[in-house]
């Protein structure tokens, strides 16, 4: 049995992810889907929680009709590239092949001896979570870029409103981050 690894942030899950997963599912018996930056949420780059991203994936995979077994595994960032692959190995079941469109991820796994399949990217110009988040904030159409089940879920959790609030509060948030930390005197 061949098990593949596919890692993404899925902020949000979009049709490009589903096309990539269609390719991955066609190549292996089981798929481990690693949810990167699992510790991050409620920021412009990572607006959705890990649980919300898992729900999006479950719904989108069901909608796509993929029948093979898959595992969803949260992968918090460690920000240390040299040990990232051993870290991933410790967090997921054994796998045989890695699917990625990210050149750094490909290099790191190749250096550890893994077979890496650089998967085709599908309409990267618009099928990008960054572009989808930008459209959500700007009030531009985004719904055609994500599976219907994900559109419904984002509406259920008021995800667009969350993003717009984050964008509106960005200036004050940035000022707070730049303010000096005051240590209380005793």
Swiss-Prot record:
Its main location: cytoplasm. It is found in: Cytoplasm. Keywords: ATP-binding, Cytoplasm, NAD, Nucleotide-binding, Nucleotidyltransferase, Pyridine nucleotide biosynthesis, Transferase. The keyword Cytoplasm applies. Belongs to the archaeal NMN adenylyltransferase family. Its EC number is 2.7.7.1. The keyword Cell inner membrane does not apply. Pathway: Cofactor biosynthesis; NAD(+) biosynthesis; NAD(+) from nicotinamide D-ribonucleotide: step 1/1. GO terms for molecular function: ATP binding; nicotinamide-nucleotide adenylyltransferase activity. This is Nicotinamide-nucleotide adenylyltransferase. GO terms for cellular component: cytoplasm. InterPro entries: Cyt_trans-like (IPR004821), NMN_Atrans_arc (IPR006418), Rossmann-like_a/b/a_fold (IPR014729). It comes from Pyrococcus abyssi (strain GE5 / Orsay). Pfam families: CTP_transf_like. GO terms for biological process: NAD biosynthetic process. It is an enzyme of class 2 (transferase). It catalyses: beta-nicotinamide D-ribonucleotide + ATP + H(+) = diphosphate + NAD(+).
